[in-house]
From Swiss-Prot:
ATP binds at residues 40-47. Disulfide bonds: none annotated. The lineage of its organism: Bacteria, Pseudomonadati, Pseudomonadota, Gammaproteobacteria, Pseudomonadales. This is Phosphonates import ATP-binding protein PhnC. One of its GO terms (cellular component) is plasma membrane. It catalyses: phosphonate(out) + ATP + H2O = phosphonate(in) + ADP + phosphate + H(+). It is found in: Cell inner membrane. It is a peripheral membrane protein. One of its GO terms (molecular function) is ATP binding. Its EC number is 7.3.2.2. It holds the Pfam family ABC_tran. The complex is composed of two ATP-binding proteins (PhnC), two transmembrane proteins (PhnE) and a solute-binding protein (PhnD). InterPro entries: AAA+_ATPase, ABC_transporter-like_ATP-bd, ABC_transporter-like_CS, MetN_ABC_transporter-like, P-loop_NTPase. PANTHER family: AMINO ACID IMPORT ATP-BINDING PROTEIN, PHOSPHONATES IMPORT ATP-BINDING PROTEIN PHNC.
């Protein structure tokens, strides 16, 4: 992979929230059209990493290159144009309760439309067939004119996915996109995202708690722990030993016993 074909390139990126280091010198490259899952324990920094990639937050140190641009070296207007090429699916999509589903989906292209068209779309949805089509792929065609406040958590997540698919971004970042869905819907939704990415050449990155879904749907898996990359390898190379090291919980470990000092090496992919 060369820098020229990297959709996302992080150079020693760190992120601090006050005294807490959320990300610690993360360096990685994700090629255009790649499909990558990010896994790790709660609080590992997965969401922070995705939001940094989306330019929602600026790294405290280090550098991000996104689609060949350095976002934080751009003017605010140029950075906004860059963001319009990136889709971000939130774990809990920030959809107003009284907003209709059709409007929520069409809002995926607000960054590509002018102000007037965006405002008119709130009153008179401009592409009802397009919204219906993408919702149908997620089993929500019958919810087209329902208010978002009437939907379940899993349905809201599917609306968030539909919105991102309608946007047609070059990079699609998804933060726990199926956490509120039952296993069948979660599997279907991730399969749909992957089919869409393969068909359109979109770069797809998803943070997931469910390791089995990450391994089943994504060719490349990155393990994050305490803000650092623990492993980065093909899904078929992820071993039980790697997962044990990634999810080891010192608070749940049994009390230490007296014995010789052991040196433990974490296997590399």
């Amino acid at each position: 992979m060369t820098a020229s074909n990297a959709a996302i390139h992080l150079y020693g990126a760190s992120l601090r929230h006050g005294q807490v280091r959320a990300l610690d010198a993360v360096s990685l490259r994700i090629a255009q059209g790649e499909r990558v899952a990010i896994i790790g324990p709660s609080g590992a920094g997965k969401s922070s990493l995705l939001h940094l990639m989306a330019t929602a937050i600026q790294p405290s140190s280090g550098r991000l290159e996104l689609l060949g641009e350095q976002p934080w070296a751009l003017s605010a207007r140029a950075r906004q144009r860059l963001r319009a090429r990136v889709g971000l699916v939130h774990q809990s999509p920030p959809l107003p309760p009284r907003q209709r589903v059709v409007t929520a989906v069409l809002a995926g292209r607000l960054g590509q439309w002018g102000t007037l068209r965006g405002l008119l779309n709130l009153l008179y949805p401009s592409d009802v067939p397009g919204a219906r089509q993408v919702l149908a792929e997620l089993g929500l065609a019958d919810k087209l004119f329902v208010q978002c406040g009437q939907l379940s958590g899993g349905q809201l997540q599917r609306v968030g996915i539909a919105r991102a698919l309608y946007q047609r971004p070059q990079v699609l970042l998804t933060d726990e996109p199926v956490s509120a869905m039952d296993p069948v819907l979660a599997d279907h939704s991730l399969a749909l995202l992957n089919r869409h990415a393969q068909a359109t050449g979109v770069t797809l990155v998803a943070s997931l708690h469910a390791v089995e879904l990450a391994l089943a749907h994504f060719p490349r898996v990155i393990g994050i722990r305490e803000g650092q990359v623990v492993f980065d390898c093909p899904a078929e190379a992820v071993t039980e030993q790697l997962l044990d090291a990634l999810y080891a919980n010192e608070q749940l470990a049994p009390p230490p016993t007296q014995g010789p000092t052991l040196t433990v090496q974490i296997p590399r992919c």
